[in-house]
Amino acid sequence: VSCGQTAVSPTPETAVVSQAETAVPQPTATEDPATATPLPAPVMATAVPTDTPSGPTPTPTSVWINPTPTVDPAIPVAPPPPEGSVVQPPYAASDCSDKYPCNEDVAAWEARIQVPPGFKVTYFARVDGQPTTMAFGPDELLYVAVQAGTIYRLNKDGVPGAYVGGYTTPTGIAFHPITGELYVASRAVEENVNGESVISIVNKGRIIEGLPCCYTFYHAANGIAFGPDGYGYVGVGGRADHGEILGTNEQDELHPYEAAILRFNDDGSEIEVYARGIRNPYDIAWDGNGDLWATDNAPDFGPPEELHRLVPGAEHGYPWYDCEVCFQPPPGVEVLPPDYTFVAHASPTGITAYTSGVFPGYYNTLFVTLWSAFPGAQSVVAVTPNGDQYDFSLGYAAPVDVIVGPDGNLYVADWATGIIFQISYIGE
């Protein structure tokens, strides 16, 4: 292994659920969501992930959590839109400026957000705080996590109510497709150095702890999704910009689970690496073909941001791909390039695959939020199944997540304003 990286012997790890519990209380949801309609029993996965190297590893646990509030996310971008498409309004950095509507100015925001002909934007809701991630529950209501640690539940009219609170920077939430339980990925503490991220189930506590964290606030356990195989999947960010350990100029042994997509049983056991080399996968999503996609924030000094269709067992590049000053890969390592790229510093965050039939011609289109205030971002990008990509919606301050609702509409969360926008199809 070159450039001072410590070799790690590849030995599979099988996590064992701890039987220990503590009396420390966990945040309790104000009310359980409606029970999900039972689905068929999950089938075993056919993909074989890579062996997990030995080293410091997270462990499943039944320790109850007592999370506390905290912190801040990343940003997204895209190529030229099709002719006649949307045009980006001027960016303004503060609430109620001459270019930036007040957060409560519904009419001004609805006029500002641009969408293609045939679509309509509605100011659906606003939550108190900075949204980081969203999920629809089995009750078909929208749940929104904010940076300060609260998860809100919005009623059908968009009125938010606190559902559960006390987490430290929750950046991933997902409902189990059979049990309806809410899974939360968050930090364990606020510190960036020697930090830790965890996965919890609301009203039950932590099921995985000791996950690597943190290069910045959002290099942690982030987006969660349940796969068609019944397993849980989570993206975990790297602990460095381009391979060096935080606070040094040297590359050291990579944590076995950093910069990777992990797969786990729904009780937190049998954690394994599904794919490697994703520097900071803020969100993940399954498409209609059964492929798993991840947004990826590239190193800070300028390479393009990335979007990957994940290949089980593959090495997707970090910390080696498209980086002249980075450490070079060991001999024999095949690095897969990204499937799509965005402009540098766009900060791709949320992703969803459109698998509804409400938007005509959009089935299996990927929608990606570009969170950054850098030129070319602050947008929702469409990536079509035939490979086209363009700005689908513009005018946001910092769009951080996008999701398809049970009604077939898109919902976009703006981190800077706390506004949740609804994009619906009304016809040409």
Regions found by a protein language model. Give the residues of each.
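Ser/Thr-rich, Proline-interspersed low-complexity disordered segments
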Residues: 6-91, 428
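Beta-propeller domain segments
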Residues: 71-116, 238-272, 279-280, 284-390, ...
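Surface loop/turn motifs at the tips and blade-to-blade linkers of beta-strand repeat domains
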Residues: 123-128, 162-167, 208-216, 273-277, ...
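Structural WD40 beta-propeller signal
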Residues: 127, 137, 176-178, 227-229, ...
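Hydrophobic core register within WD40 beta-propeller blades
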Residues: 134, 173, 224, 281-284, ...
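Conserved beta-propeller blade signature
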Residues: 141-144, 181-185, 231-235, 291-295, ...
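Blade-loop segments of beta-propeller domains
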Residues: 151-182, 186
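Asp-box/WD-like beta-propeller blade repeats and closely related beta-sheet repeat scaffolds
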Residues: 170, 188-226
